[in-house]
Regions:
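Conserved nucleotide-sugar donor-binding catalytic segment
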Residues: 132-224
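Cell-envelope/extracellular polymer assembly enzymes that use nucleotide-activated donors
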Residues: 1-4, 32, 179
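A conserved acidic beta->alpha catalytic loop
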Residues: 29, 37-48, 94, 98
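Membrane-proximal basic amphipathic "stem/tether" segments
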Residues: 229-273
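Glycine-rich, basic loop-to-helix element that forms the pyrophosphate-binding segment
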Residues: 19, 68-85
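Conserved donor NDP-sugar-binding/catalytic core segment of glycosyltransferases
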Residues: 98, 102-131
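Short aromatic/hydrophobic "clamp" motif used to bind/position activated sugar donors
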Residues: 90
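N-proximal low-complexity "stem/linker" segments adjacent to membrane-targeting elements
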Residues: 1-25
Length: 273
């Protein structure tokens, strides 16, 4: 089993250095690393060039691909990383985020998970007092995903999910990873495991943690959920038109209740954005 670590960066040199240190200090060296820089002007590109040369000179270089060029946003950058990654599992460790210790990759290999998504836990800005935990398997359902999410920075995702269901939606600015989890885990019923281990030290300087971004998050989530319900509606019709016609009144009631539930959730603060 091979792991691909994908790091996205844009004008965050100090955060990138923190991420790099935690990656190259991993005790288990059998992984590949893809770094996608969005054409930074703060010295990040020069730092990546120097890092790549030094790792090659020292005889161990996990960087299999890197680039520094303008992109169309964070999900466009992530999709670039997906295209060039060859591991069985992907982990997105973006600049500013870091592994909580040097044995994360080793422990992931030795646990021998086989689920489609393996979600570890995170600490926040170096503090376990601000820890966030992913749900246990029995707690992960549609209601959970409406009001919360799987934490992306500590989730190991099988490559085949992107190949089968598509990449991140680049039309969304903030919630495309949440949309991906919603569709593959709830609609497609892909397998999931909660790894009860702190994996990532999450930096709260990203766009999703900015309070000014919350209206965008709510708006994008509502649009995704509306599309999700409409797709479910169409899938019933396509699967069995006769049963669909018989159950249409019931479906209408269920849909109305779900919409009311969604509206209720979105009138309250969201967590784990």
């Amino acid at each position: 089993m091979k792991l691909s670590i994908i790091t996205i960066n844009f004008n965050n040199l100090e955060g990138l250095k923190k991420t790099v240190k935690s990656v190259i200090n991993q005790t288990w060296k059998e992984f590949e690393w893809i770094i996608i820089d969005g054409g930074s002007t703060d010295g990040s590109k020069e730092y990546i060039v120097k890092l790549n040369d030094e790792l090659t000179h020292n005889g161990w270089n996990p960087i299999t691909y890197w680039c520094s060029e303008p992109d169309k946003g964070i999900y466009n950058a992530m999709n670039k990383g997906i295209v060039d990654a060859n591991g069985e599992y992907f982990l997105f460790l973006n600049s500013g985020d870091s592994f909580v210790d040097k044995d994360i990759v080793a422990d992931f290999y030795t646990t021998k998970y086989c689920e489609d998504i393996v979600a570890g836990d995170i600490i926040v800005d170096g503090s376990e007092l601000l820890a966030r935990q992913n749900p246990d398997e029995a707690d992960l359902d549609y209601d959970y995903m409406v009001k919360s999410s799987i934490m992306h920075p500590s989730s190991f995702i099988r490559k085949k999910l992107f190949e089968k269901f598509g990449y991140y939606d680049e039309n969304l600015k903030i919630v495309s990873d949440w949309k991906f989890f919603l569709y593959v885990l709830i609609k497609e019923n892909c397998s999931y495991a909660h790894w009860h281990r702190f994996v990532t030290d999450f930096a709260t300087d990203g766009i999703s943690e900015n309070e000014l971004s919350h209206p965008i998050i709510w708006s994008e989530r509502k649009a995704v959920l509306d599309d999700f319900l409409n797709r479910y509606h169409r899938s019933i019709e396509k699967r069995d038109k006769r049963i669909y016609e018989i159950d249409l009144p019931l479906f209408t009631i269920i849909k109305r209740r779900l919409i009311n539930k969604i509206n209720k959730f979105f009138s309250e603060p969201l967590c784990n954005l």
